[in-house]
A protein has these predicted regions:
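Glycine-rich Rossmann-fold phosphate-binding loop(s) that bind the pyrophosphate
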Residues: 155-156
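Rossmann-like adenosine-cofactor binding region
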Residues: 55-61, 179-272
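An N-terminal-biased, well-structured beta-alpha scaffold segment characteristic
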Residues: 1-92, 198, 218-220
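N-terminal Rossmann-fold NAD(P) dinucleotide-binding loop
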Residues: 159-160
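Short, flexible hinge/linker loops that cap or flank conserved catalytic cores
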Residues: 142-146, 167, 223-224, 273
C-alpha cells in the first residue's frame, strides 16, 4: 500500500515522526507540491494525504488508482467531494484536533489588543519606561474584560471553548447560533445576527465558510457595530471583507481587527490591512501548536488504519 503525503511540511516540519503511518504501508513524504507536480507524484498512490493541495475533478480523473484521500485538516474544501465520491474515493478529515489551540489563540489576540502588549513592549525598548517620572508608564487606554460583552458567531467546538474561557474572565457571553436556546448553558444568551453586531464589545467569528457566510462582515454589517468594537477572526479569512475592515479601521469606525486567517494565503503584501496599526495579524498559526499537530498526526494514521480495516471513520463524502 503506497501512501503519499503531498504537503507534509506545514503540519510536520521535522519535530514529529511518521512511525504510525509507516506501519501501514510505504510512505513517501513531499514537503510541498505544486499544481504541476501533484499528478505525477500521486499517480501510483493508493492513499494520498494532503493539507492545502487542491484536488479538483480534473486532477482526480488522472488518478485511477487512488482509493483514499486523507485531509490533514478539519476543512475539506480543497477536495472536490462529489467528484471523489463518483470515482469511489473515500475522503476523510480531522475534526476537533485544534479546538484548545484555536480558542487559546483567540484570547491571545484579544488580550494583545486590550492590554496593548505590542505597543508597550516597543515603548519599553524605546526606553519610555526607563526615563519615565512615575513607577509605571502608560499612554493609551487599557481594557478589562470582566463585564464586557463577547459576541460569538457560531457555537461549534471552538465557539463553545471560547465561550467557556470568556466566562472565566467574567464576560457576558451572547451568540448567534443555529442551536436552540434550550440546548445552551443558561449563561449564554442567544441573539440575532443584528443583535450580536450591535451589542458586542468584542465579536469573534467561529462559523464555517459557506455561500451564506462569505463576507459575513462587510461594510453594511460593520456599520451596525460599535465604533470601538474589537473584531476577531480565527475561523476563515473570507468570512470578512478585508477592504471594508481596513476602511473601517482607517475611518475609526472599528476599534481593532485581530485575525489569524486571511482571504488569500499567503497574503499579498498590498493587502490594505497591513497599513492599519489597529490590525493585529498572525500568519495562520492558531492550529499549529506542537500538541495540536501531534494529535493531528495520530488521527491521520488512525483514519488510514480504519480505512484499511474496512471501517473508515471521519468520512466527509459518505
Amino acid at each position: 500500500m503506497k501512501i503519499v503525503i503531498l504537503d507534509g511540511y506545514a503540519a510536520n516540519p521535522g519535530d514529529l515522526d511518521y512511525h504510525l503511518l509507516e506501519q501501514l504501508g510505504e510512505v513517501v513524504v513531499y514537503p510541498r507540491t505544486s499544481d504541476e507536480e501533484k499528478v505525477e507524484r500521486a499517480k501510483d498512490a493508493d492513499i494520498i494525504l494532503l493539507n492545502k493541495v487542491q484536488m479538483d475533478a480534473e486532477t482526480l480523473a488522472q488518478l485511477p488508482n487512488l482509493k483514499y484521500i486523507g485531509i490533514q485538516a478539519t476543512g475539506f474544501n480543497v477536495v472536490d467531494i462529489a467528484a471523489a465520491k463518483k470515482q469511489g474515493i473515500i475522503v476523510t478529515n480531522i475534526p476537533a484536533y485544534s479546538t484548545d489551540s484555536v480558542a487559546q489563540m483567540t484570547f491571545a489576540l484579544i488580550l494583545a489588543v486590550t492590554n496593548r502588549v505590542e505597543h508597550y513592549t516597543q515603548e519599553n525598548r524605546n526606553d519610555r519606561w526607563a526615563y519615565n517620572k512615575d513607577f509605571c508608564y502608560w499612554d493609551t487606554p487599557l481594557m478589562e474584560l470582566a463585564g464586557k460583552k463577547l459576541g460569538i458567531m457560531g457555537l461549534g467546538n471552538i465557539g463553545m471553548k471560547v465561550a467557556n474561557i470568556a466566562r472565566q474572565f467574567g464576560m457576558d457571553v451572547c451568540a448567534c447560533t443555529s442551536k436552540n436556546s434550550c440546548d445552551l448553558p443558561e449563561w449564554i444568551q442567544k441573539v440575532s445576527k443584528d443583535g450580536l453586531l450591535a451589542t458586542s464589545d468584542i465579536l469573534t467569528l467561529h462559523c464555517p465558510l459557506s455561500d451564506d457566510t462569505y463576507h459575513l462582515i462587510n461594510e453594511e454589517n460593520i456599520g451596525k457595530m460599535k465604533d470601538t468594537a474589537i473584531l476577531v477572526n480565527t475561523g476563515r479569512g473570507p468570512l470578512v471583507d478585508e477592504e471594508a475592515v481596513a476602511k473601517a479601521l482607517h475611518d475609526q469606525k472599528l476599534g481593532a481587527y485581530c485575525a489569524d486567517v486571511m482571504s488569500q494565503e499567503p497574503p499579498s503584501k498590498e493587502n490594505p490591512l497591513f497599513k492599519e496599526p489597529n490590525a493585529y495579524l498572525t500568519p495562520h498559526i492558531a492550529w499549529a501548536t506542537f500538541e495540536a499537530r501531534k494529535r493531528l498526526n495520530r488521527q491521520v494514521a488512525a483514519n488510514v488504519k480504519a480505512f484499511l480495516e474496512g471501517n473508515p471513520i471521519n468520512v466527509v463524502n459518505p
